[in-house]
Amino acid sequence: MKKGINRVVLVGTGAVGCSYAYSMINQGVAEEFVLVDVNEAKAEGEAMDLSHAVPFSPSPTKVWSGSYADCKDADLVVITAGLPQKPGETRLDLVEKNTKIFKQIVRGIMDSGFDGIFLIATNPVDILTYVTWKESGLPKERVIGSGTTLDSARFRYMLGDYLDVDPRNVHAYIVGEHGDTELPVWSHATIGVQKLETILANNEQYKQEDLDKIFENVRDAAYHIIERKGATYYGIGMSLLRVTKAILNNENSVLTVSAYLEGQYGEKDAYVGVPAVINREGVREIVELELNEDEKAKFAHSVKVLKETMAPVL
């Protein structure tokens, strides 16, 4: 790490990686931004294209294509590399294929002398974040997955649309696996400072069955998008940007990242999407919500599925 200069290395210049890269340059988040890909020509082309956008950015960024050696001085390495989810394929279906890819990537990065923070986006993200932690040997606080940041954003957007409220004033979380077993924390959902359950009780036009449908659309959003355009990338690109800003700016912001549990929520030895305080050190602490009995059971099931899926590849 260079004093006073933030360096971010992106590994993987597919649609997700490039959406994140464009967001980073667009907002001028880091002084140095390096693109790494097994397809070196692709990384070079993307770096050239992005560098031409720098004059329009709010602050200058040095952009180049590089190698794992550039990770030595990096504050943050973001990994989006891996095989994408195909139509009809679940995130967990990808586990064996992408675990093999990830082990090679992480070893290459660590061989550079990297001692910063990992941010993982490749699916199945909770499992691959765990794999990264194990392979890297870094402290658990400095290995983070995108978790349910995107799911929570989708949730806030759809609830805001339903209630005709700015989604930035919707405070609601999706937790658990980033995938089919995720769950909404209805018991802590608020609009501004008012509980969602209170709004529901006092307004006949709002119905629980509508909210349940909203959650289903959140959970299945990736399937719907993949069916129509082949992949999702804008939303996750912005999600990664948000986590990056929280880290580099030492924000102490609460985001639903994939973080390591060691007793919180009654679970341990798993990376799962939960609210956590994010700053320059990575995960400062996990915010433990008081879940109701139904939410507790669903969360425990989500963790169980992740562990069962992960066991054969570790």
Curated annotation (Swiss-Prot):
A molecular function GO annotation: L-lactate dehydrogenase activity
Keyword Phosphoprotein: yes
Known regulation of activity: Allosterically activated by fructose 1,6-bisphosphate (FBP).
Protein residues bound to substrate: 85, 91, 123-126, 151-154, 232
Subcellular localization: Cytoplasm
Residues reported to bind NAD(+): 16, 37, 42, 68, 82-83, 121-123, 146
CC per GO annotation: cytoplasm
The protein's enzyme class: oxidoreductase
UniProt keyword Cytoplasm present: yes
Binding residues for beta-D-fructose 1,6-bisphosphate: 156, 171
GO biological process: glycolytic process; lactate metabolic process
Pathway: Fermentation; pyruvate fermentation to lactate; (S)-lactate from pyruvate: step 1/1
InterPro entries: L-lactate/malate_DH, L-lactate_DH, L-lactate_DH_AS, Lactate/malate_DH_C, Lactate/malate_DH_N, Lactate_DH/Glyco_Ohase_4_C, NAD(P)-bd_dom_sf
Chief location: cytoplasm
Known EC number: 1.1.1.27
Catalytic reactions on record: (S)-lactate + NAD(+) = pyruvate + NADH + H(+)
Active site: 178 (proton acceptor)
Keywords: Allosteric enzyme, Cytoplasm, NAD, Oxidoreductase, Phosphoprotein
Role description: Catalyzes the conversion of lactate to pyruvate.
Oligomeric and partner information: Homotetramer.
Family: Belongs to the LDH/MDH superfamily. LDH family.
Protein name per UniProt: L-lactate dehydrogenase 2
Originating organism: Bacillus cereus (strain ATCC 10987 / NRS 248)
